[in-house]
């Protein structure tokens, strides 16, 4: 048993599985069932894991190990609710866990885990926060860092959702620091903390924070096999926002495969994000196929509205966004409004302007400005400045240039290249009459950004604007300049003779991601193999 537990703690699920299966072949016990269940969970075999936790529960009850039975019951509750979405089953198993712990009459760390699950079920934000703070206190009292930092990470997410963004992100940072320092015993706890962190960063478009922690935690994530399907989906969303679309596609497709293998009913998380990527790329038919059947999914609202707008179906986008952002245009922002509604309002401004409803666009832009002021994050600040600038351009009055400059600065700070390029395009429109040379420069910069991102539809719009300004538009192969920043890094490492695994170690990316980048580099540069890539890099260095 000790060998199996040690294997679990170092993340070696296959070794642990062999140990516990061997133990169960000799005698069935709660400890062996629970150990095998944890190994199955780490291998993403969620249905089998839940089944073996149930068996562990029954065995512990027979053995009259009350605290262990309560632990098994709350874990079944966790898996059935969070993985399979079976809320009634989750409630039943959680009630069983609470009853057993009450029956045992002991003060133990298990009460902390139960409080965490209760927080997931609690709709009221204040009550949820209270449960989590109590769980943190229990973890500290018993010296159980898994409880303490899991609850701390989740509390950070709750604070972000209630617009206490900076306070919440500091808590998630602390939980990640503990995970990276090796303070946590359970691989599943580390997994969940990373998933919560990626979800939080995606929610507020905090690309720099996600990027820093990915570098800091690269070794841990590889060693302990941390990135599960939900993590990959959220990380793919962050990579999409960061303009690293090739990497995003790899993560999202891998996430879909993970979901298909372990929990196909929850694959909407990756499908919605992949659909968002396709809209940005201008691959609208593929996006529509990915969103088929997800019309009522709350996470699909923004992507679906963006798809409608891109297809010229502004009325459908308007109806959807108005329903999902219903509220006062004049009142004080409600709790959680900036985090959840802000991005939808930014898109609604585009929809109203497309319909030439400038008055409605201005009302929404003003509402967006109020909630951006409440959150004070760079993304919403930039989105509000862009919306105000767009309204100024549409009205032909106001200081559009100043607003758009502010948006450019904030989008650059947030490391959001797609939004940065769109703002440059708006700047070109704003200055077309008064400063045509500056407008041409802005449009050219936008076109280059869109081409680098491979955002075909937006690149066409930028090219058309340049032509209308009387500027020549370059066509044909772009050579080395068409490579993304990451592809250029990969090319340089190929050029010095590194293998794919060596490149992956150097850049903290997976071997599959390296293969994807190498294939793109060869295709873009018209090269047939790595030897030609080495020769290409050598020629480039010689010509400088």
Q: What annotation goes with each model-predicted range?
A:
Residues 52, 442, 517-520:
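Residues within the DNA-recognition helix of helix-turn-helix
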Residues 16, 49, 89-90, 128, ...:
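Single-residue signature of alpha-solenoid repeat helices
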Residues 415, 464-467, 473-544:
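Helix-turn-helix DNA-binding segment
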Residues 360-426, 469-480:
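Generic long, charged, amphipathic alpha-helical segments
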Residues 17, 24-25, 54-65, 78, ...:
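Amphipathic alpha-helical segments of tetratricopeptide repeats
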Residues 1-25, 35, 117:
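Alpha-helical segment of the N-proximal tetratricopeptide repeat
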Residues 5-9, 34-44, 70-86, 110-125, ...:
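Tandem amphipathic alpha-helical repeat scaffolds
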Residues 27, 34, 63, 67, ...:
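Residue signature of alpha-solenoid helical repeat architecture, marking inter-repeat boundaries
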């Amino acid at each position: 048993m000790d060998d199996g537990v040690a294997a679990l703690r170092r993340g070696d699920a296959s070794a642990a599985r062999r140990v516990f299966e061997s133990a169960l072949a000799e005698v069935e016990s709660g400890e062996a069932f629970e150990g095998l269940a944890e190994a199955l969970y780490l291998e993403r075999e969620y249905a089998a894991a839940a089944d073996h936790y149930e068996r562990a529960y029954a065995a512990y009850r027979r053995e009259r190990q009350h605290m262990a039975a309560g632990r098994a019951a709350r874990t079944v509750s966790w898996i059935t609710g969070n993985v399979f979405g079976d809320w009634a089953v989750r409630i039943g198993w959680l009630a069983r866990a609470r009853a057993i712990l009450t029956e045992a009459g002991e003060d133990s760390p298990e009460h902390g885990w139960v409080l965490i699950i209760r927080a997931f079920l609690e709709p009221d934000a204040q009550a949820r926060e209270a449960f989590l703070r109590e769980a943190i206190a229990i973890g500290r009292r018993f010296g159980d860092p898994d409880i303490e930092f899991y609850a701390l990470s989740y509390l950070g997410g709750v604070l972000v959702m209630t617009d206490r963004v900076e306070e919440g992100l500091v808590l998630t940072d602390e939980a990640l620091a503990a995970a990276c320092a090796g303070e946590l015993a359970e691989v599943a706890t580390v997994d969940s903390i990373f998933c919560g962190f990626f979800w939080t960063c995606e929610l507020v478009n905090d690309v720099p924070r996600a990027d820093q922690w990915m570098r800091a935690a690269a070794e841990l994530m590889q060693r302990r096999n941390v990135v599960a399907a939900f993590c990959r989906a959220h990380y793919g969303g962050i990579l999409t926002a960061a303009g690293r679309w090739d990497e995003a596609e790899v993560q999202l497709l891998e996430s879909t495969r993970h979901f298909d293998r372990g929990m196909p009913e929850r694959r909407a998380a990756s499908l919605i994000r992949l659909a968002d990527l396709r809209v940005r790329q201008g691959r609208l038919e593929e996006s529509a196929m990915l969103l088929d059947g997800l019309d009522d999914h709350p996470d699909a609202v923004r992507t679906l509205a963006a798809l409608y707008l891109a297809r010229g179906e502004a009325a459908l986008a308007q109806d959807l966004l108005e329903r999902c952002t219903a509220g006062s245009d004049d009142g004080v922002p409600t709790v959680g409004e900036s985090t959840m509604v802000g991005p939808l309002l930014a898109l609604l401004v585009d929809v109203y302007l497309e319909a030439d409803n400038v008055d409605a666009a201005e009302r929404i832009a003003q509402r967006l400005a109020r909630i951006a002021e409440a959150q004070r994050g760079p993304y919403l600040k930039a989105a509000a400045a862009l919306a105000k600038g767009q309204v100024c351009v549409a009205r032909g009055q106001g200081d559009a240039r100043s607003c758009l400059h502010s948006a450019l600065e904030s989008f650059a700070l947030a490391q959001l290249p797609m939004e940065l390029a769109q703002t440059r395009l708006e700047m070109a429109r704003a200055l077309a009459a008064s400063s045509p040379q500056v407008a041409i420069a802005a449009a050219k910069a936008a076109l280059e950004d869109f081409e680098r991102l491979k955002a075909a539809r937006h690149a066409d719009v930028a090219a058309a604007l340049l032509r209308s300004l009387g500027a020549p538009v370059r066509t044909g192969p772009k050579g080395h300049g068409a490579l993304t920043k990451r592809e250029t890094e990969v090319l340089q490492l190929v050029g010095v003779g590194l293998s794919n695994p060596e490149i992956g170690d150097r850049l903290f990316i997976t071997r599959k991601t390296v293969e994807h980048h190498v294939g793109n580099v060869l295709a873009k540069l018209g090269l047939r193999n790595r030897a030609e890539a080495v020769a290409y890099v050598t020629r480039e260095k010689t010509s400088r």
